[in-house]
């Protein structure tokens, strides 16, 4: 972790007070499984926290920066910024993958550059940063790494199928859209998910993805295209 600490200090002016917390953020579930460590020793709990922190900072930035945009437009922009591919690219730009502690099997299968793994790593780092130094430092880091891309409109045109489906259905009147994860397959470090989307209790489509977010987006996409099958 010493090299990681040096990188964070040199690139972002960050010095973690709790090195064990930083180590946890960079520990994949495949590593804890192989080393027979407790499940809470991997970065999944920090990922959960970082996801919320990221969403809040991005939402606040978009709200203040685009006073002319309606809620639906802001939701589309936020969704495109925090989608799997975007967060994986942010993680790559920070060079985080190099420092991730992976199990040998996951390493051999290319897990170090897997999109969902890098997405989760980026969120876990934000969660650790929040605990260690508070929301102000999380905001500064996001403004340094993420916001420049938002200013360039890099993510405005990315399709968010969940929001698009909601807009299509709302034209017909009152609607209640829900998503449900129907199936989880594969080992903990290489999960696949099948999601279904419903409108007022009626199933509209299903989707397959390497994360719950991706599966739900695929289900919404298939619903829009009228394809009620898994793909």
UniProtKB/Swiss-Prot annotation:
One GO location term (cellular component): cytoplasm
Record Pfam families: dsrm (PF00035), Ribonucleas_3_3 (PF14622)
Biological process, per Gene Ontology: mRNA processing; regulation of gene expression; rRNA processing; tRNA processing
Active site feature: 51, 123
Catalyzed reactions per annotation: Endonucleolytic cleavage to 5'-phosphomonoester
Record-annotated DRBM domain positions: 160-229
Source organism superkingdom: Bacteria
InterPro entries: dsRBD_dom (IPR014720), RNase_III (IPR011907), RNase_III_dom (IPR000999), RNase_III_sf (IPR036389)
Top enzyme class: hydrolase
Cellular compartment(s): Cytoplasm
Cofactor(s) in the UniProt record: Mg(2+)
Function noted in UniProt: Digests double-stranded RNA. Involved in the processing of primary rRNA transcript to yield the immediate precursors to the large and small rRNAs (23S and 16S). Processes some mRNAs, and tRNAs when they are encoded in the rRNA operon. Processes pre-crRNA and tracrRNA of type II CRISPR loci if present in the organism.
Similarity remark: Belongs to the ribonuclease III family.
Protein's name in the database: Ribonuclease 3
Organism field: Lactococcus lactis subsp. cremoris (strain SK11)
Chain's gene name: rnc
